[in-house]
Amino acid sequence: MKFLLAFSLLIPSVVFASSSKFQQVEQDVKAIEVSLSARIGVSVLDTQNGEYWDYNGNQRFPLTSTFKTIACAKLLYDAEQGKVNPNSTVEIKKADLVTYSPVIEKQVGQAITLDDACFATMTTSDNTAANIILSAVGGPKGVTDFLRQIGDKETRLDRIEPDLNEGKLGDLRDTTTPKAIASTLNQLLFGSTLSEASQKKLESWMVNNQVTGNLLRSVLPVKWSIADRSGAGGFGARSITAIVWSEEKKTIIVSIYLAQTEASMAERNDAIVKIGRSIFEVYTSQSR
């Protein structure tokens, strides 16, 4: 599978969707905000026609594990520039293990390639694997500098796992906006930052995500496909960023962020499902 190339569209050149088209989506999001006493941000970018819609798209939300796509994109970029060898290995030490490392915790005393570390963190959200990648790409600062280089002036990474998931209200560290992350994903997967081979690798890691089956994938329209990366953190943070495309190659970029809620994980997951279903309805109803 190969993504539609999106005509090199970036957020500054998009056309804002009519309010009526996403009226039901907005109503659904607002209702969920009230029911969960949450703060929610959503963005949708149609890469076929540049149409864009958001709800609280410029508000900041905790990145949580959605940063992992950017960190691994930075690794791919650095490899293309000859700055790092993705096949180089790192010894796994017990002292380096952090919370939630389902792959790496079984490999203490062994070595792992950077490429395999990206596969682990992108498909299982392994946090120690993410820290291994961060160490290889210049740490949080290296990721933030990379973001600025490709035109993202909002998204920032300041800490490593697991501290970056703290999620305090008003803390600018380790945050993004729904609008900024959509633009960045568009650039990384469809722009000129990465080679086609690197884009395909990044895409495959997202397609093979093993931890999002109960989120957008559970309400994906028939004959549609998805590549995604989710996250969760303190103070009710829950998030997902996704590239979704139809059999006709119609491709949309979706970002959903929740924060500042006491809702359970199950309730937050259900919120993402409901928002996703509402968004998908906009596009499937057009083809009926």
Curated annotation (Swiss-Prot):
Which GO MF term does the entry hold, naming one? beta-lactamase activity
Q: Where does substrate bind?
A: R229, S230, G231
- Name the InterPro entries on file: Beta-lactam/transpept-like (IPR012338), Beta-lactam_cat (IPR045155), Beta-lactam_class-A (IPR000871), Beta-lactam_class-A_AS (IPR023650)
Question: Which EC class, in a word?
Answer: hydrolase
Where does the signal sequence lie?
A: 1-17
Assigned EC number: 3.5.2.6
Which Pfam families does this entry report, sorted A to Z?
Beta-lactamase2
The UniProt entry's GO biological process terms, in alphabetical order, are:
beta-lactam antibiotic catabolic process; response to antibiotic
Give the domain of life: Bacteria
Q: Which residues form the active site?
A: S65 (acyl-ester intermediate)
- Whether Flavoprotein counts among this entry's keywords is no
Record comment: activity regulation = Inhibited by clavulanic acid, sulbactam and tazobactam.
- Which reactions is this enzyme annotated as catalysing? a beta-lactam + H2O = a substituted beta-amino acid
Q: List UniProt keywords, sorted A-Z.
A: Antibiotic resistance, Disulfide bond, Hydrolase, Plasmid, Signal
* Miscellaneous section: The class A beta-lactamase family has a specific amino-acid numbering system, sometimes called Ambler or ABL numbering and often misspelt as Amber. A multiple sequence alignment was used to derive a consensus sequence and then the consensus was numbered taking into account insertions and deletions. This allows use of identical numbers, e.g. for active site residues, despite differences in protein length. UniProt always uses natural numbering of residues, hence there appear to be differences in numbering between this entry and some papers.
Q: Which family does it belong to?
A: Belongs to the class-A beta-lactamase family.
For this entry, the protein name equals: Beta-lactamase CARB-6
**Species this chain originates from:** Vibrio cholerae
According to the entry, what is the taxonomic lineage of the organism? Answer: Bacteria, Pseudomonadati, Pseudomonadota, Gammaproteobacteria, Vibrionales
